[in-house]
Swiss-Prot record:
The keyword Cell membrane does not apply. This is GPI alpha-1,2-mannosyltransferase 3. One of its GO terms (cellular component) is endoplasmic reticulum membrane. It comes from Xenopus laevis (African clawed frog). Pathway: Glycolipid biosynthesis; glycosylphosphatidylinositol-anchor biosynthesis. It is found in: Endoplasmic reticulum membrane.
Length: 531
């Protein structure tokens, strides 16, 4: 009731100048709608049920409209692992043999797979789409939490602007329904922010926000980077510091870590501290640079501008007009970007979890626009529409489209099909998108953990001289796979090998308009004619 009373008082003060008649009319409307929706127990997740259903429905639509691949981890570090956990076959990359990844996140999808198996519905379509739909539902609920956070801190009008900016973000559209640890990190960070004790918050709960932060850390240890300044700020502001540490920080940290260790003990077969291994490899030793390195300013000059896109001017404007109590959020964003900048290996998705925080500042910008507001709305929608649709429906779709050709090999009776993927490692999904134990191989690319200067992985060795590698690898025709998959750019280099061994092109799918390096515009499947 205290929250409702404060809202009533705010509306009264705002409308005193409008006369008694208008005031009585607004008061009546407040008690019939606004007060009921402000109650924590109203509808779903403390919000209007229709809003929650609409938000989830939007993300489900978003999910169905994203039919492209982004990075290998969305399959190889989640669905592929879950498939191995449930069906006892599926490829585990070197990160799993070295204990750098934990089973907590794949366990969610393994549970889905197990239910489908028990129901006799473990068809490949369900195995591909239901995990993504589950992630879409969580992202939709996170959107509602972001809206609710701002509504409780400020007002409904500002909350609508923040939510509008969140829905317009092309990069959120691109990532929010993918089975990436970064996506789950963003979801949990948004939940945590809703319960974080910001000044003026009526939804704060130290226990709930710390649980969300702890879960994010278990799923992706670098999630703690965003929360380091926020945790210190909370500690500095807290009067009962000893109680906060003893009753909140330590119990939650110990329990969640114990749960993670237990899960990993079950699936690794030994005690494995994956969070420490992950941080040691990627942060302390900076060995992620094996997969590429960028200059220190990359996130500032490319990363942030690309993921914010046309939100950037509104974000900058929002930073100038947002009340001072939100400065800690800006500090958290800046700290995250600068910390990731210190690491050699950089990717757009690494800073995706700061995007919902940035939307708060964008919302303040729109709320404070005095002129050109309608033009700004149209500009933001249209400027994000093209990249959202292009990246979601066209760019890099071949990696998924080619899987339909592989799935058909499973349907052939008495199939003795075998497959070799002659592409940069992990370019396409694996057993999680095939769901049958046909023989499949690919060019591997584990990093050198022995620190040898002469080390070269299999994929790089292949691309030094593809034709020579193939002739050496398949020196006996009995070793030849029945099918080969490759990017179009490789075909001219190995055409003689294909011809001499009776390989014929059986499938061609479009992949990208922007081929570069070892990636081609199309993906080909070749089938060997043994007659």
């Amino acid at each position: 009731m205290e929250k409702v009373r404060s809202r009533v008082g705010w509306l009264y003060r705002r409308q005193d100048s409008q006369g008694a008649v208008q005031l009585r009319k607004r008061k009546s409307r407040l008690y019939s709608k606004e007060a009921s929706s402000a109650c924590p127990g109203a509808g779903l997740f403390g919000e209007n049920t229709y809003l929650v259903l609409a938000a989830v429905g939007f993300r489900i639509f978003n999910c169905m409209m994203v039919q492209t691949s982004f990075v290998p981890d969305e399959y190889w570090q989640s669905l592929e692992v879950a498939h191995n956990m449930t069906f006892n076959y599926g490829y585990l990359t070197w990160e799993w043999t070295e204990g750098l990844r934990g089973f907590s996140y794949p366990l969610m999808f393994a549970a889905i797979y197990k239910v489908l198996y028990l129901l006799g519905k473990d068809h490949v379509w369900f195995l591909i789409w239901i995990p993504r739909l589950a992630q879409a539902v969580l992202s939709g609920i996170a959107d509602v939490r972001l809206y609710s956070l701002v509504r409780h801190l400020e007002n409904t009008e500002l909350a609508k602007w923040v939510y509008f900016c969140q829905l317009c973000s092309w990069f959120t559209w691109y990532c929010a329904t993918r089975t990436l640890t970064n996506t789950m990190e963003a979801v949990l960070s948004t939940f945590a922010l809703y319960y974080y004790p910001l000044e003026g918050s009526s939804t704060n709960s130290s226990t709930k926000y710390l649980i969300c932060v702890a879960l994010a850390f278990l799923i992706r240890p670098t999630a703690v980077i965003l929360w380091i300044p926020l945790l210190f700020y909370h500690f500095a502001k807290e009067k009962k510091k000893a109680e906060l540490v003893v009753q909140q920080y330590l119990p939650i940290g110990i329990l969640t870590l114990a749960a993670s260790l237990t899960v990993d003990r079950i699936f690794f077969g030994k005690w494995t501290f994956v969070q420490w291994n992950f941080l040691k490899f990627n942060v302390l030793q900076d060995l992620g640079s094996f997969y590429g390195s960028h200059p220190w300013h990359w996130y500032i000059t490319q990363g942030v501008p690309v993921i914010l896109c046309t939100h950037l001017p509104f974000f900058i404007h929002g930073c100038m007009v947002t009340p001072k109590r939100y400065q800690i959020l800006l500090v958290a964003v800046a700290w995250t970007v600068l910390t990731y900048s210190a690491l050699s290996h950089k990717e757009f998705r690494f800073i995706y979890p700061v995007l919902p925080v940035c939307m708060v500042f964008c919302g303040f910008s729109f709320s404070n626009l005095k002129r050109w507001k309608k033009a700004a709305v149209g500009f933001l929608v249209l400027s994000n529409l093209f990249p959202a649709l292009y990246t979601g429906l066209i760019h890099q779709r071949g990696a998924l489209d080619i899987m339909s050709g592989i799935q058909k090999l499973c349907k052939m009776e008495n199939s003795s099909a075998s497959l070799f993927v002659l592409m940069p490692c992990h370019s396409i999904p694996f057993y999680s998108h095939v769901h049958c134990p046909i023989k499949m191989n690919f060019l591997e690319c584990p990093p050198d953990l022995s620190d040898s200067d002469a080390y070269i992985d299999e994929a790089d060795l292949f691309y030094v001289s593809p034709l020579a590698w193939l002739n050496a690898e398949f020196y006996n025709k009995t070793l030849l796979p029945t099918h080969l998959i490759m990017f179009s750019v490789l075909e001219p280099e190995i055409r003689s090998f294909l011809t001499n061994n009776n390989y014929l092109k059986s499938m061609s799918v479009f992949h990208t308009h922007l081929p570069e390096g070892r990636t081609g515009s199309h993906i080909y499947m070749y089938e060997r004619n043994s007659k």
